């Protein structure tokens, strides 16, 4: 229980959309930030439990306003990098085989290509109820000084309270 230490706002939503536009991506329609999807899904009662990492991610993202990706380290192939996806790059993001064009979007890449971003994560690296090793990316922006750090601190506290081991690796 308790009160959420962060709250989203129009300023947070605008800064996140600007982050997505950084490389030329257009965050409209079904390509909105995942944090905006969570607001609607929560209001509709459509957020089900997946696993501790994703459930905590959803709570922190919903209240803090920053999109968060969680991938299964046992389904991804190192090395990892964050970069802007080239035009024409896409991947399957759900079990139905739907694809997302990620060209111009800041994304997490593994050795096989892009696998996560602030809109939708790739199906090939998604977590499952049995996932035990995850990599989390909080898609923060320098326009929101301290918010990424605060979001991670809250995420860490919640996961550690559930018995998870958490380590940090910052990138810019």
Task: Place the predicted regions along the sequence by residue.
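Non-transmembrane, aqueous-exposed alpha-helical and coiled segments at domain scale
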Residues: 1-172
């Amino acid at each position: 229980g308790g009160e959420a230490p962060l709250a989203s706002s129009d300023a947070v939503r605008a800064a996140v959309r600007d982050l997505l536009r950084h490389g030329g991506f257009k965050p409209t329609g079904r390509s909105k930030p995942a944090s905006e999807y969570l607001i609607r899904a929560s209001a509709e009662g459509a957020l089900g439990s997946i696993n501790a990492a994703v459930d905590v991610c959803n709570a922190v993202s919903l209240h803090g306003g920053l999109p968060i990706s969680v991938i299964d380290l046992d389904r991804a192939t190192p090395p990892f990098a964050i970069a802007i996806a080239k035009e024409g790059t896409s991947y399957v993001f759900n079990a139905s085989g739907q694809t997302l064009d990620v060209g111009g979007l800041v994304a997490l890449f593994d050795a096989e290509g892009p696998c996560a971003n602030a809109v939708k994560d790739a199906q090939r690296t998604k977590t499952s109820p049995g996932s035990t090793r995850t990599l989390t990316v909080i898609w923060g922006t320098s326009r929101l000084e301290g918010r990424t750090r605060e979001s991670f601190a809250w995420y860490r506290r919640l996961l550690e309270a559930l018995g998870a081991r958490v380590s940090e690796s910052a990138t810019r």
